[in-house]
């Protein structure tokens, strides 16, 4: 039952994050006169700010709501942008001083993602 509750919480956050991404991207794209993908850049950076705020808010808090953290970090940010997760994982590798893994992860993600497209 707990897995179902967690899954539904994350799904709701993901749905809201996806809609927020669509609306913000549409708003920015309609007001932009350049071919530069400004809306994607804004969404990705904003997603990083949100996930950073969530982890800072809930870090080392014993009474923090696990459900709210999952809703925001995994659900909303996951639906809003996967770039925030990539950046958070990269930052974690940096904090752990796993610099070789960090360089490999960033390089592989960008290069493999580029060629996969």
Q: At which residue positions do the language-model features occur?
A:
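Membrane-interface helix-loop junctions in multi-pass transporters/channels
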Residues: 1-117
